[in-house]
Each structure stands twice: as C-alpha cells, then as structure tokens.
Amino acid sequence: GYMKVYLMSTYKDEMTAFGLGILSEPNVLVTAGYFGALCIFAGAILRPVGGAIADKLGGIKSLYFFYGTVCLLAIISATFHLPFGIAIFVLFLIMANLGMANGAVFQLVPQRFGKDIGIMTGIIGCAGGLGGTALIKTFGWSKGAFDGYTAGFAIFAIVVFIAIMGISLVKTRWRTTWGIQAGGRI
C-alpha cells in the first residue's frame, strides 16, 4: 500500500542499508513491504486488545486514549523529519492504536445498536474502508502538491482530533440514554 510508497520516497537509502545489512534482502521494495506489513499486522492483531481494554475501561475512555495517541504521533510526524528507526516505530504505534481503536468502537456498537448490529458493523466497516482510501489519497496529494508528507500527516491529525471532539460532544448523551440501558461500560 501507500506506506511502502511513503517509506520508499522518504527513507530509500536507510531501507536499502537495512535490507542488505539485516535482512540480506537486495530489493528495497521487498524491505519496504516488510515494514508496511509489520505496521498493518500491528493494527490487525491488536484489535482484540483494544476491545478488551474497552471492556475494562469503557469504549469512550479507550477511544480518547487511542485517538489521542494517534493524533499526537501524526503531529510529531508532520512536524519533524524523523530518523528511519523512529519513523518505523511511530508508524507501528499509529497502526497499533488505530487497530485498538477499532476494537473499542466495536465494544460500543452492540450496546448502542443491539438490534441492528449487522448493518451497523457493515456501515462502520465501510466508513473505515473509505477513510483508509481517503487517507491514502491525502498522502498522495500531499506528496504531489508539496513534495512531502507534512500536509498529509497534519490533515490526518486534524481528522483524528475532529473524531475526538465528536466523541466529546455525544458522550454525555450516550451515557445518560442508551449507556444506562445497556448496562455496559461506555
């Protein structure tokens, strides 16, 4: 995906050295693919962890933490040209927190939409897919318009901040209406 493109255009020399020295991989595209796969793996494998955290702390508190972390890391990525190893770690953490946020969202869904859970999971999955596509396009636009990814990371941080504000606007109503009826942690 686009993470490979980002890594290739920003850290090609570092990835080439890492690929040859550590992985014995002469093809830098393969090395970039490994790093992209590692970050995607973090997002996928940690979804249940996010759900478990939301079961303990509540979905809203969990989303605040996960989205807050993503927002902060996106701001850091927009503000600084990070060294290669730190950039990989930051991307890993962004994807891990997005995956855990997914688990937290699905902790809330059955409480709010118990009778319509099938359609709601479909709608939420669709929104996630469209959001991922929009993110890719935003990074592509950023690279084309500004020859870098700063604007893409900044827009990503703004969108995540808007999500945090959206949660803040509805949390009291959620807790005093369906949250009480559901009996779960929201």
Each predicted region: which residue ranges?
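Interfacial helix-cap and linker-helix signal at transmembrane-aqueous boundaries
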Residues: 7-8, 53-54, 138-147
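Multi-pass alpha-helical transporter architecture, strongest
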Residues: 157-186
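Cytoplasmic membrane-interface "Motif A"-like loop-to-helix N-cap segments
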Residues: 55-67
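A membrane-interface helix-boundary motif in multi-pass transporters
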Residues: 141-159
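Extracytoplasmic gate region of multi-pass secondary transporters
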Residues: 1-45
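Intracellular juxtamembrane helix-capping segments at the cytosolic ends
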Residues: 100-113
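Helix-to-loop junctions at the C-terminal end of transmembrane segments
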Residues: 46-58
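C-terminal ends and interior cores of transmembrane alpha-helices
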Residues: 68-82
